[in-house]
Amino acid sequence: MPSNDPIQLLKEIRQHKTQKELATILGVDTKTISRWENGHIAPSPVVGLALKDLAASQAKPKAKTVAKKKTKPKFTFIDLFAGIGGIRTAFEEQGGECVFTSEWDSYAQTTYSTNFPDSHAINGDITEVDAEDVPKHDILLAGFPCQPFSIAGVSKKNALGRAHGFADETQGTLFFDVARIIHERNPKAFLLENVKNLVSHDKGRTFDVIKRTLETELGYHIKYRVIDGAHFVPQHRERIIIVGFKKKTDFDFDEIELPPKNQRVIGEILHKTDGSEPVLEHDEGKYFDHGKKKPHDKYTLTDGLWTYLQNYAAKHKAAGNGFGFGLVHPESVSRTLSARYYKDGSEILVYQGKKKNPRRLTPRECARLMGFSDDFKIPVSDTRAYKQFGNSVVVDVMRHAAKIMAPKL
């Protein structure tokens, strides 16, 4: 059990960490560490608690490396347009094993591989992957981008009385690659995730082609539902989920027990400033200053940016437009976190009192807002992290979908 003496704790921790590493984690400089060690000043009670947490994490015995017999998974799945693995997380929790991953963005690959150190490599551009090289699997997962389908070629075939299939209608879009892999590998089921507007995109033509492709061309029984992430996290985030089974099942989205919306509030995911914020060693002190018990000052908007956002909002309001920054309080539910959050953070700004400018969420808070646990590692820059979480899924929504899908296989 770790000592309660902060100096003794400091000695124990320093056997494993340099002054610089420890200073980064605690949000102090190396001179302060030296002064503690030399007895010139004593660590504050808050720092003492942080040191105790660190010492406890170091004291945990490392598990012996024993060759374990691999447990047979309940099902296998592939992860297309994988992002940082939000959908995968949910299906692994149901006993599934990921046997193939595709994600084109190299920075997202870094985050994904850090959190899912697989034996299989991450494939890049799905358009360059031969369907025959994709392993057989039970479930295909894909959060594919929303793109319009050209109807020029289809209209011509209709006029000539020729048959046309999904390859004609969807060629040149990323949905085509989803369809061709389903066609070639014939999984038992699939789950596709997209923005709510997929249904109305291109005057409904986009969704019509997708439904026709999945049902008529590929022979799947599909159901779909728009679900708001606000049932599970303090964020309005409406996304459509399309589930298909090769065999007819009694799958029904009504089996998902949706908690009332807006019960979760932003205060739950914000860094705690009362001394209870956990020390996350893998965050390396990048987001939160445990010494000062607050997020680093870099997340607070500059006077110039805050003035600009207020003036810009006033200008649009006067013109009758809807633009405005989203100022949130601890009891608020936020707007949708987008991939552009890195630009100015305007859609979700945390109120810090009348005498201080608001601040952006930190990347760790964004992870929490999307339903990722604090164990999730963020190995990329803030800019990349904001984009990745803004493009991700609410893990809890996927978790509930996976829970009712798995038994139907």
PLM regions and their residue ranges:
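Short alpha-helical DNA-recognition segment
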Residues: H16-S34
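C-terminal target-recognition/interaction regions appended to catalytic cores
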Residues: Q19-L22, S44, P295-L409
